[in-house]
Structures are given as structure tokens and as C-alpha cells.
Regions:
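Walker A (P-loop) phosphate-binding loop of ABC-type ATPase nucleotide-binding domains
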Residues: 35-39
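Helix-to-loop junction immediately C-terminal to a conserved catalytic motif
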Residues: 48
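Short coil-to-beta microelement around the adenine-binding A-loop and adjacent beta1/P-loop entry
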Residues: 14-15, 70
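Conserved ABC ATPase "signature" region
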Residues: 96, 100, 107-125
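Conserved ABC transporter NBD signature motif
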Residues: 56-67, 71-72
Length: 130
């Protein structure tokens, strides 16, 4: 089950989501329909951790998304309709996403990422948007 509990997202002064409450039962397939600017893309990008809500909670199978992003990403399939999927990710988030698609655990991702960042002298850029 996926639950959005009072989820809001504000970009600068623009409110993209305003207290969204939504429950999607396990096994259901849904579509989001609405006019431009209604918050459809923001809702999906929040669910797959491309962006983070300003407030509220997203719960997937009883786990709060912000405290367990990698484990939850393993349960959700997402294909972007535009090539901007990676434009707002930090280096750390990008490699977590790529590694999780290969079935790596969070510990494996952290260990491997630490090794690669040190190898290429990139540690100082881990949390910068790429």
C-alpha cells in the first residue's frame, strides 16, 4: 500500500502540492489525471525520491519513505516521460538509484560508493546536485 499523508511541496513561492492525502491499495494500478500544474509529476517524483516533499509523509508498505528510501525504491518501478530524471539528484542519490537497480543492499551501496568516491578524489562532491 502507498499512502500520502498531508504531503506538500513548495518550489520557491509556487505550491505544487498542498496537503495531498491519497491511499493506493496494494496491487492496484492507477493513473493521475489533471491539468498542467496540478501536481501529477510532483506526486510521482516525490514517491520515487527524485524530489523531496516540503512537508508530510509518504508511506510504502508501512515504511516511511524519508527514513528508508533505498529499500522502498526497490519496490517501485518508474519510467520517466522526459530525460530530466537525473537532473536534480545528488551524486549520492544518483549512485544509490543505479546500484539499487542491480539489487545491491544499502550497505553494499554505501561501501562501494565510499570506495569509488575516494578512488576518484570525489568525496567532497557526494551531496552536490550533478
Amino acid at each position: 500500500m502507498i499512502e500520502f499523508r498531508n504531503v506538500s511541496k513548495v518550489y520557491d513561492q509556487t505550491v505544487a502540492l498542498d496537503g495531498l492525502n491519497l491511499t493506493i491499495e496494494s496491487g492496484k494500478i492507477i493513473g493521475l489525471i489533471g491539468h498542467n500544474g496540478a501536481g501529477k509529476s510532483t506526486t510521482i517524483k516525490s514517491l520515487v525520491s527524485v524530489i523531496h516533499p516540503t512537508s508530510g509523509e509518504i508511506i510504502v508498505d508501512g515504511q516511511e519513505l524519508s527514513s528508508n528510501r533505498l529499500a522502498i525504491k526497490e519496490k517501485i518501478g518508474y519510467v520517466a516521460d522526459s530525460p530530466d530524471l537525473f537532473l536534480r539528484l545528488t551524486a549520492n542519490e544518483f549512485w544509490e538509484l543505479v546500484a539499487s537497480s542491480y539489487g545491491m543492499t544499502l550497505d553494499e551501496v554505501e561501501s562501494r560508493l565510499a570506495y569509488l568516491l575516494e578512488l576518484f578524489d570525489f568525496e567532497g562532491h557526494r551531496y552536490e546536485v550533478i
